[in-house]
Amino acid sequence: MKVVLSLGGSVLSNESEKIREFAKTIESVAQQNQVFVVVGGGKLAREYIKRARELGASETFCDYIGIAATRLNAMLLISAIPSAAKKVPVDFMEAEELSKLYRVVVMGGTFPGHTTDATAALLAEFIKADVFINATNVDGVYSADPKSDTSAVKYDRLSPQQLVEIVSRSSAKAGTNVVIDLLAAKIIERSKIKTYVILGTPENIMKAVKGEAVGTVIA
């Protein structure tokens, strides 16, 4: 089975022990599956982008800084995964080529203007993944931002079309925190790849790989 895991930068802590826990889980999954991991930029990206804006950088240049940060995080994770390719691919074709030699391929961002969620969804489509797992800091897709709206309802299961509708609605509201971005949602709809949106813990990743009920399932 081909598994694509989007690991948010906020989920991948700077603590070495937590990185090791994720690495062990990925190694375990890779024993019987081909695993592709796309890592977010997290705090590192935010700090560098903030400084770059203060220094007058364009938004596109800031995107490139964010991409560089995701690739640094990818290298950090690779350091803890013996079976992973030691090279961070810069595009999907290179990722696919590396997967012929390694059970685990870890990459960061690719295109300016694309989040790593969108990158991971596009990668999943490109390699014809069997499952796409979006590991984030929320335990699924909600009707509203659960951190600011106590009446928000969590969805256990959604169709790809419903996901696009919910994300479109949320994205239109200023200042809202969307668990998955609109481009990623549209790619999921187009590719029809089974998707899990989960709270990013090693345990939840294993559950999603096994097809157990966890987070929000989009199918």
Swiss-Prot record:
Coiled coil: none annotated. This is Uridylate kinase. It comes from Archaeoglobus fulgidus (strain ATCC 49558 / DSM 4304 / JCM 9628 / NBRC 100126 / VC-16). It comes from the Archaea. The gene is pyrH. ATP binds at G9, S10, G42, R46, T136, N137, Y142, D145. HAMAP family: PyrH_A (MF_01220_A). Belongs to the UMP kinase family. Keywords: ATP-binding, Cytoplasm, Kinase, Nucleotide-binding, Pyrimidine biosynthesis, Transferase. NCBIfam families: pyrH_arch. GO terms for cellular component: cytoplasm. Pathway: Pyrimidine metabolism; CTP biosynthesis via de novo pathway; UDP from UMP (UMPK route): step 1/1. GO terms for molecular function: ATP binding; UMP kinase activity. Its main location: cytoplasm. Catalyzes the reversible phosphorylation of UMP to UDP. It catalyses: UMP + ATP = UDP + ADP. Inhibited by UTP. Homohexamer. Its EC number is 2.7.4.22.
